[in-house]
Curated annotation (Swiss-Prot):
Gene assigned in the entry: ytmA
Keyword set includes Protease: yes
GO molecular function terms noted in the UniProt entry: serine-type endopeptidase activity
GO biological process, alphabetically ordered: proteolysis
UniProt family annotation: Belongs to the peptidase S9B family.
The organism's place on the tree of life at top rank: Bacteria
Organism annotation: Bacillus subtilis (strain 168)
PANTHER family: DIPEPTIDYL PEPTIDASE FAMILY MEMBER 6, SERINE PEPTIDASE S9 FAMILY MEMBER
Name of the protein: Uncharacterized peptidase YtmA
Record lineage: Bacteria, Bacillati, Bacillota, Bacilli, Bacillales
Catalytic residue positions: 122, 236
InterPro entries xref list: AB_hydrolase_fold, Pept_S9_AS, Peptidase_S9_cat
Region forming the signal peptide: none
Length: 257
């Protein structure tokens, strides 16, 4: 439910931008909405950002990139960010911010209700997994780009994030295993009904490609539709030209689903 909608300066004449304040489990959470300026009915695109706090913040240029392909895009900032209420979590209670954002797109007058896609980058990958599980057949597709799928693996791989993870999650995977398991929903992947696309650079050192391998394997075991675009020379951040090309390709992939 939208509490407030304010115009935000857009560098593109083809896309209108708004900052949105919406309700998520009673909290006022902020996000960025992009609408194509041309009137019409569009697919919805839930953009789930990476990072935490000021790292990996939602960038208007990135949102416009996707909206320009013919989508109404909504990107939640997550609770505790940019004036939003509550404390930021890490694929914990903040999953509700993604669920509520999906429902917000369902209620948008210019969005085709049965054509809402989930996109997650980096930390947004696990947020997308959780949302695809929660929404089941309501989601048209799910794309994870350099996405996290396993929080214990993230803790092991990213020594630089351990302090933050212990603070936000409440301890180490050994101390609070149930908290990490709750945030790593492999046991519920059977509830995903949307076709899945996994995009990953094999040289990614922020989120190792192991995360995509694990999710791919799980989906295949369950005979779920999954496609993979793995790039042997790319890291977590793809070169700009390739990035733009893949944006066009993945949005076309979504529309074909």
């Amino acid at each position: 439910m939208i509490v407030e909608k304010r115009r935000f300066p857009s560098p593109s004449q083809h896309v209108r931008l708004y900052t949105i304040c919406y309700l998520s489990n009673g909290l006022r959470v902020k996000g960025l909405l992009a609408e194509p300026a041309e009137p019409g009915q569009y697919d919805g695109f839930l953009y789930l950002r990476g990072g935490i706090k000021s790292v990996g913040m939602v960038r208007p240029g990135r949102i416009i990139q996707f909206a320009s392909q013919g989508f109404v895009v909504f990107a939640p900032f997550y609770r505790g960010n940019q004036g939003g209420e509550g404390n930021e979590d890490f694929a914990g209670e903040d999953r509700e911010d993604a669920f509520s954002a999906f429902r917000l797109l369902q209620q948008h007058p210019n969005v085709k209700k049965d054509r809402i896609h989930i996109f997650g980058f980096s930390r947004g990958g696990i947020m997308g997994m959780l949302t695809a599980i929660e929404m089941g057949g309501q989601a048209a597709s799910f794309v994870s780009w350099g996405g996290v799928s396993d929080m214990i693996l993230t803790y092991e791989e990213r020594q630089d994030l351990r302090r933050m993870m212990k603070r936000v999650i409440g301890g180490t995977p050994k101390k609070v295993p149930e908290e990490y398991q709750w945030r790593t929903p492999f046991d519920q992947v059977n509830k995903i009904q949307a076709p899945v696309l996994l995009i990953h650079g094999e040289k990614d050192q922020n989120v190792s490609i192991q995360h995509s391998y694990l999710l791919e394997e799980k989906l295949k075991q369950l005979h779920k539709p999954v496609e993979t675009w793995y790039y042997s020379t790319f890291t977590h951040y793809f070169p700009p030209k390739e990035n733009r090309r893949i944006v066009r390709q993945l949005t076309q992939w979504m529309k074909n689903r």
